[in-house]
């Protein structure tokens, strides 16, 4: 086994456990964090006495990261006590006898620095006492040593400060969750982170980050100048501890538990009174009557408180419903406006398209009519010479016909005139006697055939 594996803390010390909690309770509570190799609960069942007030437990996990996560369960109420979860630096769970003989306590424990990290008091030049923390790992890695603290600083605060680093040169307005995720991912398990924007004149923000393990401080210091949102981070030792929210005390946790138990007991009493038959009821004694009156007063007080709580809860629910209703109405109105605007835009767009189409159709009709008119004009121009020629031909033909008819009439007249003249001559001449046919010249050389 290497030295690095030896330094890994895999054992969790759980203190301030209620005596009513069993081993199964503790196992089921921490088993979901990771695989448990071993679990010891002290004092054991055979060693619990009437003077035993609390229990303590040691849990060995298979993975050291489970120890880091389990520390966030500190102040979780189990039965009637708020538990405290701390890493146990030794590699082996102590047995019960050696644990109690060495002064081990079952009450709320206190976190300790790793064994190789030591504190010592040293006087400064001006005579004041300072607390110096020596970590050999920082020296080996060439990292700056822990800054000195006042000698009267509480040991618990010293341990917290030595697990905390200062982070500077953060962008203004940066989200704290982003810083938390960054350090969790690259440097180590973070227990707390506190953001500070600083004065307006300061060009950057800063933060304090507290790790679950002191060894994570070395990882963070080695990454001084880490690039985050195009800015080099300034990572240094912190001189102060993070101011944390007030933890719930045992008295507060116990008061809440007693209130819950009393409410449950009152409910059981009411159920028992309803189920009790009239025959089993007895006349109460004066003492019982006083106790009954006290219980009635307690019940009335509890009922009033419960009614008040329910009333406040109903008021909150009504307010929440009103807000949701207003939000829904606003969303509906917004959607309605959006739909109307969208419909108007669509209608305008359709109208524009219709008008555009109508204009296009009109243009096309106009162009078509213009083309038709031009075509007709061309046709009329091309047909007019033919018409003129036809008309002239008809006139010429008519004239020829008229000329022919007039000429025919003239010829007929001439012919008739010739005939009349030939008939007159025929009568004056004697008839031939020889029976021969003679040719006679008649006007203009026409030949006429005559028979006997």
Curated annotation (Swiss-Prot):
Coiled-coil positions: none
Region (Disordered), start-end ranges: 258-452
Pfam families the UniProt entry points to: RRM_1 (PF00076)
Subcellular localization(s) per the UniProt record: Nucleus
Post-translational modification: Extensively phosphorylated on serine residues in the RS domain.
GO molecular function, one term: RNA binding
Compositionally biased tracts (Basic and acidic residues): 259-272, 291-305, 383-421
CC annotations in GO: nucleoplasm
Regions that span the bilayer: none
SS bond list: none
PANTHER family: LD29830P, SERINE/ARGININE-RICH SPLICING FACTOR
Protein name listed in UniProt: Probable splicing factor, arginine/serine-rich 7
Organism: Caenorhabditis elegans
Lineage: Eukaryota, Metazoa, Ecdysozoa, Nematoda, Chromadorea
